[in-house]
């Protein structure tokens, strides 16, 4: 997972721009609700901004139902977010400009391209932040769906999901990947947490994110496919160049040196892939025994 640049739009300006365009309809009194809650929501938006550096969003308390009883206003705040609104389109365009264009990789899994602006604090939980630009994070379909509304442990008041805009990554790989068996003539891996990880908040939050979004099985499936493709390529390369090496082991060790040089670069799944290639004795034995001239 990685850090992104977030929108610079002012939260109160966005809220007022959307709210001032609201009209009262037959079933809802949106304009009246906006006017009634405006000052309270402004205070909440200011408090959100004060809690991103350093990040302490877990200490926020929603206006509803703790401090307010009008749930019709909460629904109005919740429904202010819509991908069709110009203000949201502008935030999305800004995020794309700041983070590499429309083909932004999901900053959580780094596997798929982003498809949604996810509400880090779910609008079902705190609707007053439904259009806060700093609360909108570009995520892929998978991570957006898995995250759902479970962002906070109510028992410990600790956040469960890494905030790609304001959390600082631990700087280390908390996962490892090993080939554990050969199935149908192809290596099969296991992705697990590293042992002996330091007990600090950054590492704990990353582990919690992988767990709650169920990313380890997704990484495993991806690495298994990558290993299958790579093994076919390696076998073909040895057939074409076997005369350049002293032995099959010599060839494989040289390949591993290349993988080793790439273990600290690339996306999470690319690093797990190279980890499996370099640190799996079962794979070493299988490759050397199956290289053919």
Name what the model sees in each region.
Residues 113-197:
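Glycine- and acidic-residue-rich phosphate-binding/metal-coordinating active-site segment common to enzymes
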Residues 82-95, 118-125:
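Short Cys/His-rich Zn2+-coordinating modules
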Residues 93-116, 140:
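Short cysteine-rich loop/turn motifs with clustered Cys
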Residues 2-88:
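N-terminal accessory alpha/beta regions
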Residues 179-221:
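Short flanking/linker segments adjacent to small metal-binding domains or redox-active Cys/His motifs
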Residues 10, 69-74, 132, 138-140, ...:
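Alpha-helix initiation/capping motif
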Residues 1-28, 203-293:
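C-terminal, charged low-complexity interaction regions
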């Amino acid at each position: 997972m990685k850090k992104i640049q977030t929108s610079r739009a002012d939260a109160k300006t966005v809220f007022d721009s959307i709210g001032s365009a609201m009209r009262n309809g037959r079933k809802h009194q949106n304009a009246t609700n906006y006017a009634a809650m405006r000052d309270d929501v402004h205070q909440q938006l200011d408090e959100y901004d004060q809690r991103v550096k350093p990040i302490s969003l877990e200490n926020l308390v929603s206006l509803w139902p703790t401090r307010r009883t009008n749930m019709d206003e909460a629904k109005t705040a919740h429904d202010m977010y819509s991908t069709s609104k110009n203000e949201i389109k502008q935030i999305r365009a800004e995020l794309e400009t700041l983070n590499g264009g429309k083909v932004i990789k999901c900053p959580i899994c780094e596997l798929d391209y982003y498809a949604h602006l996810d509400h880090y604090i779910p609008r079902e939980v705190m609707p007053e932040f439904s259009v806060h630009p700093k609360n909108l994070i570009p995520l892929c379909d998978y991570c957006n769906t898995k995250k759902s509304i479970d962002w906070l442990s109510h028992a410990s008041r600790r956040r469960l999901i890494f905030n790609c805009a304001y959390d600082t990554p631990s700087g280390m790989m908390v996962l490892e990947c090993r080939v554990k068996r050969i199935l149908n003539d192809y290596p099969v891996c296991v992705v697990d947490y590293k042992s002996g990880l330091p007990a600090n908040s950054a590492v704990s939050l990353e582990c919690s994110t992988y767990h709650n979004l169920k990313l380890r099985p997704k990484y495993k499936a991806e690495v298994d496919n990558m290993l299958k493709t790579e093994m076919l390529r390696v076998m073909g390369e040895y057939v074409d160049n076997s005369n350049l090496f002293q032995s099959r082991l010599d060839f494989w060790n040289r390949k591993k040196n290349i993988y080793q040089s790439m273990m600290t670069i690339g996306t999470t799944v690319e690093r797990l892939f190279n980890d499996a290639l370099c640190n799996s004795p079962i794979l070493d034995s299988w490759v050397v025994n199956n290289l053919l001239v």
